[in-house]
Regions:
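Condensing-enzyme catalytic core of the thiolase-fold
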Residues: 2-361
Length: 361
């Protein structure tokens, strides 16, 4: 079955160093480094106490780098008023919730036919199932015996799926009860877009918000990737580079508003891009998260181009995963080379935020 084209008609972002696509582009063009040290008091412990100089750490409570991509100044931009939830309630929620609220609202307001479509609007959220800062804080309060009446909002316990439902309800979306979140690791945002497109193509919705957020407990992330020996000890993101030594965690959120292309054209929407095909794959019983299967990537890319009615030679720009881990990058180079063959295409990394995102093959 041919993929019915879907238009991206609005977008919104809250990213390290940028709160819009234009700001991010300008930062990239300027070669700005959007990575930096962990914000003060973010970890609730002196980061210097946790830093291990060597990668081969012998305990699980150390980190090999204190750098990451952090959204700074968000509280000055986020307005908790105007939602169907009281501002006081929103104030007590973890920043992860607020990032989703903010980007979903901005994307919805960017749709020209938004108000008329509200009753037929849904939301899908890509959100990794890691503990948030709020969940960690709540757990600390429980363990330390803080009375229930004095604890932070208990909804912070549910930082994986609840943000999608609360955001949809806060925006009074007609399909709010169908809003959901998903975790497909690094492919989560692509799955969110695919499932949002499915809802449009099946006639279940007329407008879909496909959102993604990364705002887990940053100490948990740094320790976890250190234990996996996947965290860059130099704190530098260097995808497809011979000196790449791991990934650098970053936080942020984004949301795109999607409509069927024919409807978007009819209603005079501003069309930012058109999705003509999507390919998905799963490694199944593979080697693990840090050792993706080459064959699975080849099948996913081939399926995407087939559903779009395109050939690899038709592609002018390729955005790669390219985390900066040597095994993962090597697999991606091989799979992409198999799909594109002799066709040379400019390539960049969608996760590279230190100001040098374009790598040409």
């Amino acid at each position: 079955t041919r993929f019915e084209p879907v238009a991206i008609v609005a977008q919104s972002y809250a990213l390290p160093g940028a709160f819009s696509a234009e700001e991010l582009w300008n930062r990239v063009i300027a070669g700005a480094d959007l990575l930096g040290p962990v914000p003060e008091r973010r970890w609730r412990v002196d980061p210097a106490r946790l830093l291990a100089a060597e990668l081969a750490v012998t305990t699980l409570d150390r980190v090999t780098s204190l750098r990451g991509g952090y959204v700074r100044g968000f509280d000055d931009r986020f307005d908790p008023s105007g939602f169907s939830l009281p501002a006081a309630e929103i104030h007590g929620l973890d920043p992860l919730f607020k990032l989703v609220f903010h980007t979903a609202r901005e994307a919805f307001l960017g749709v020209r036919g938004g108000p008329a479509l509200r009753a037929r609007t849904g939301l899908v959220l890509a959100n990794l199932s890691f503990p948030s800062s709020g969940l960690s804080h709540f757990a600390e309060q429980v363990w330390s015996g803080v009375p229930a009446r004095n604890r932070i909002d208990a909804r912070n316990r549910f930082s994986s799926g609840l943000p999608a439902l609360l955001a949809a309800r806060a925006l009074d979306l007609g399909l709010a009860d169908r809003a959901f979140a998903l975790d497909a690791a690094c492919a989560s945002s692509l799955y969110a877009v695919k499932l949002a497109c499915d809802a449009l193509q099946d006639g279940e919705a007329d407008l879909m918000l496909a959102a993604a957020v990364s705002r887990a407990d940053d100490l948990f992330i740094h320790m976890g990737f250190t234990a996996l020996k996947a965290l860059s000890p130099t704190g530098r993101s260097r995808p497809f580079h011979h000196e790449a030594d791991g990934l650098v965690p970053a936080e942020g959120a984004g949301c795109v508003a999607l409509r069927r292309l024919g409807d978007a054209v009819r209603d005079g929407e501003r069309i930012l891009a058109v999705i003509r095909g999507i390919g998905l794959g799963n490694d199944g019983r593979g080697h693990g998260l840090l050792a993706p299967a080459e064959e699975g990537q080849v099948k996913a890319m081939s399926a995407a181009y087939a559903s779009a009615g395109l050939a690899p030679e038709d592609i002018g720009l390729l955005e790669c995963h390219a985390t900066g881990t040597r095994v993962g990058d090597a697999v991606e180079i091989r799979s992409t080379s198999r799909v594109f063959g002799a066709h040379t295409v400019p390539a960049g990394s969608v996760v590279h935020v230190n100001g040098d995102p374009t790598n040409r093959w």
